[in-house]
Regions:
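N-terminal secretory signal peptides that target proteins for export/translocation
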Residues: 1-14
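A helix-centric hydrophobic-segment signal that preferentially recognizes long
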Residues: 5, 16-20, 27-210
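Short, intrinsically disordered, low-complexity terminal segments
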Residues: 10, 24-26
């Protein structure tokens, strides 16, 4: 019996099986890697959209002190209302969300309520001031600041919607079978994010009318 032939035959079989195993590993691993990369990309898109949203919130926050001072100087506007606006601004800017908070409904709701309170409870009072205090209409600075505020509120709403769209795409991929399997296989580094829920009036920015 030719032992070289036997050894050679077994070597060929082993190599064939090894190649088959390697091929199977790549066949399953490659799509998994692609799905993992896709989840990473969508998660980063959510982070980018959130940064855009925070930027618009900061822009709004920066406008408010000037508005308060302008109203205070141009009219005998109720001091208590100006205090409420200032406090609402402080409350809205005091809540800082950490990475884990984006998956916590309670913390996201608290953040949203603080922002909505500033937009639709406090800043709306400044809009009423325009109607009740005609002298404000003669203030060019007040008019310019209010127009900037209206534009900023619209950008805030748009940024919020874009964040929700990014979260929807991310959560959808994470919820698919392949996304779920890859997430479990890699130690569950991805968690579903929380949407901004629509509240009454929050989908419409305060309107400036002169």
């Amino acid at each position: 019996m030719n032992t070289n032939f036997v050894v050679g035959g077994w070597s060929s079989v082993l190599w064939s099986r090894l190649l088959l195993c390697v091929s199977l590993v790549f066949a399953f691993a490659l799509p998994g890697c692609e799905k993992y990369d896709e989840l990473v990309a969508k998660d980063q898109d959510c982070q980018a959209k959130w940064s855009d949203y925070e930027g618009e919130l900061q822009r709004r926050s920066d406008l408010i002190p000037g508005l308060v001072e302008t109203v205070k100087g141009a009219s005998k506007f109720e001091a208590s209302t100006l205090t409420q606006i200032t406090q609402a601004r402080a409350d809205a800017t005091s809540i800082k969300l950490q990475a884990d908070d984006f998956t916590d409904p309670a913390k996201m709701e608290a953040f949203q309520k603080a922002q909505d309170k500033l937009s639709h409870s406090s800043l709306s009072r400044l809009l009423i001031a325009n109607e009740n205090y005609p002298q404000l209409q003669a203030s060019a600075r007040y008019g310019e600041l209010m127009k900037q505020l209206e534009a900023t509120e619209n950008r805030v709403l748009r940024a919020r919607q874009q964040y929700n769209n990014a979260v929807r795409g991310y959560n959808t991929e994470l919820g698919k079978i392949k996304g779920s399997v890859v997430n479990k296989a890699t130690g569950k580094p991805f968690k579903p994010r929380v949407y901004f829920a629509a509240t009454a009036g929050s989908e419409v920015a305060p309107k400036v009318s002169f």
